[in-house]
From Swiss-Prot:
NCBIfam families: hisC. It comes from Staphylococcus aureus (strain MSSA476). One of its GO terms (molecular function) is pyridoxal phosphate binding. PROSITE patterns: AA_TRANSFER_CLASS_2. It catalyses: L-histidinol phosphate + 2-oxoglutarate = 3-(imidazol-4-yl)-2-oxopropyl phosphate + L-glutamate. Gene3D superfamilies: Aspartate Aminotransferase, domain 1, Type I PLP-dependent aspartate aminotransferase-like (Major domain). Its cofactor is pyridoxal 5'-phosphate. Belongs to the class-II pyridoxal-phosphate-dependent aminotransferase family. Histidinol-phosphate aminotransferase subfamily. Pathway: Amino-acid biosynthesis; L-histidine biosynthesis; L-histidine from 5-phospho-alpha-D-ribose 1-diphosphate: step 7/9. Keywords: Amino-acid biosynthesis, Aminotransferase, Histidine biosynthesis, Pyridoxal phosphate, Transferase. This is Histidinol-phosphate aminotransferase. One of its GO terms (biological process) is L-histidine biosynthetic process.
Length: 352
């Protein structure tokens, strides 16, 4: 076994609603608001597509997901040779890390961000430099100070998970202009579709200026396909060619591909869902206590508090399962009825 595995632990999902009911003696419904899933679910066209292809389950998928690749290529106006799919972004991150990193290499990222950047670097015996957050978001200037000619990968998450904060187009453009051109910069935009701020980066446009800027997106969040696992990277043709060597032959299932194509085609449904999310998100920031809420461009809100366990349990007592962190609680934005319950708790909670 690799010795570095002793530094890590397997991913631990939160307790199920049933287990939480037993642990806390809760009666009534519990709502899972801990994993940033799209509670509205996928487009109805997704269910139609799945039903239409159920008789194909005994076939292996078409390797490389060519139908979905063509759809993404048209949607983003990028060449198909620049797209690679994974079974969720978890697998994409794993493939990139495995293809790029060798023992002793170094990655640079943020201290409080998606944990798989760190996890996969350690698996490959690489070193990890984690720069502290600044005002709850990525400190791009601080990260630049740690990047040099020998850096192997830079991971940025925009908007950031778990804080929900973002950096703008000008900041990313300036950052990329100062990174050595041979150092890959991976920009994880898993929550891109929820963004409403106009100065959010046009990363696809920046890729025309910077060959080392690579973009990650997923169908797990706004498109509502977390259970089917489809994510992808848009990168240079050369990078995709090499990373494709790492990709398992049939990693995205046949049903997942059909579902993702159907979801992508129904942009009207996506707009409706993301609009509902932005309306409900704004309700949280109307509270007088919103000074404790980091500004979010996602479908979740990070609530800062020194009394993490107390807030987690207070929300649990009104039927809402959230995600505790050392410095606060991450809340997935739910339906109006669920949000009403959480807003009542948040408006009466003592944060200090």
């Amino acid at each position: 076994m690799k010795e570095q595995l002793n530094q890590l632990s397997a991913y631990q999902p939160g307790l199920s609603p049933r287990a939480l009911k037993e642990k806390y003696g809760i009666e009534g419904d519990l709502y899972k608001l801990a994993s940033n899933e799209n509670l509205y679910g996928p487009s109805p066209k997704v269910k139609e597509a799945i039903s239409a292809h159920l008789d194909e389950l005994y076939y292996y998928p078409e390797t490389g997901s060519p139908t979905l690749k063509a759809a993404i290529s048209k949607h983003l106006n990028v060449d198909q040779s620049r797209i690679l799919f994974g079974a969720g972004l978890d697998e994409v991150i794993l493939m990139i890390s495995r293809a790029v990193l060798t023992p002793g290499d170094t990655i640079v990222t943020s201290e409080a961000t998606f944990g798989q950047y760190y996890h996969n670097a350690i698996v490959e015996s690489a070193n990890v430099i984690q720069v502290p957050l600044k005002d709850g978001g990525f400190d791009l200037e601080g990260i630049l100070k740690e990047v040099n000619e020998d850096t192997s990968l830079v991971w940025l998450c925009n908007p950031n998970n778990p804080t929900g904060t973002y950096f703008n187009h000008e900041s990313l453009d300036s950052f990329l202009s100062q990174v050595p051109p041979h150092v890959p910069v991976i920009i994880d935009e898993a929550y891109f579709e929820f963004v409403t701020e106009e100065d959010y980066p046009d990363t696809l446009a920046l890729q025309q200026k910077y060959d080392n800027a690579f973009l990650l997106r997923t169908f797990s969040k706004a498109y509502g396909l977390a259970g089917l696992r489809v994510g992808y990277v848009v990168a240079s043709e050369h990078a995709i060619e090499k990373w494709n060597i790492i990709r398992p032959p049939f990693n995205v299932t046949r049903i997942s591909e059909y579902a993702a194509v159907a979801a992508l085609e129904d942009q009207q449904y996506l707009k409706e869902v993301t609009h509902k999310n932005s309306v409900e998100r704004e309700r949280f920031y109307q509270l007088p206590q919103s000074e404790y809420f980091l500004p979010s461009q996602t479908n979740f809100i990070f609530v800062k508090t020194k009394r993490v366990n107390e807030l987690y349990e207070a929300l649990l007592n009104v039927g809402c399962i959230t995600r505790p962190f050392p410095t606060g609680v991450r809340i997935t934005i739910g339906f109006k009825e669920q949000n009403d319950k959480m807003l009542e708790v948040l408006s009466n909670f003592k944060y200090e």
